[in-house]
Amino acid sequence: MSSLLTPSAFATEDVRRTVLDNGLVVLTKEVHTSPIVTNMIWYRVGSRNEELGQTGKSHFLEHMLFKGTDRFKKGEIDLLTLKNGGANNAFTSHDFTAYYFNFASDRWNIALEIEADRMVSCTFEAEEYESEKKVVIEELKTGLDSPWGLLLQEEEATAYKVHPYRNPIVGWLQDVERATVEEQQAYYRRYYHPNNATLVIAGDFNTEEVLAKVDRAFGAIPSGPPAAPMLHKEPPQ
């Protein structure tokens, strides 16, 4: 019974940690049980980084990273994923924003190319931004239509009086409605840098070959300014 209650050693053994010159942390683990590779990049930015009046920026940005880059135009990321038999998705939390791809091990390199490009070259076309804003607002309203969604929002807003954890990850409706594309671009350039990210790759591959590919894809991307520390202190209640 005790083995069921303790973390599996397999989960962390043989994980290799590499840091590129630009600060990108790379965690790799070879798993040869099936011919699949999972590529996941985590940015250290979430709703906790948002000031009141600017909520929802992290989640909205997650949406925009699927809407095109300088190299991959609107719809091409999902199309390439499907054509190569893969899967992709993303999520935003209070503390992180993460994007992942699953591919067969003979064609997963496209994930590196996409992630490297959208780290620095996400396009913010005004028309596309306004269109996606409607999608995000509808997502927000759908969540509030659920009794559990409304309860969670009120619970967090009550539990935290100062800390940004009190704000919903999708943002407050009025903040999302009045947000501008220029604000979203500035937020992107502030937090999406190699030294504010961790790239996790696990699956059927050779580690040395993978690290060489990662360096080719991300190595030339310059570091960004350090993200400002979050100093919000929640008073005793």
Spans of model-derived segments:
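Active-site SXXK
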Residues: 55-69
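Bacterial peptidoglycan biogenesis and beta-lactam-recognition machinery
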Residues: 66-70, 120, 125, 206-208, ...
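Non-catalytic beta-strand/loop surface segments
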Residues: 5-47, 71-107, 142-196, 220-237
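Non-catalytic, conformational "gating/processing" segments within enzyme and secreted inhibitor domains
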Residues: 185-217
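M16/insulysin-pitrilysin zinc metalloprotease superfamily fold
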Residues: 68-71, 102-133
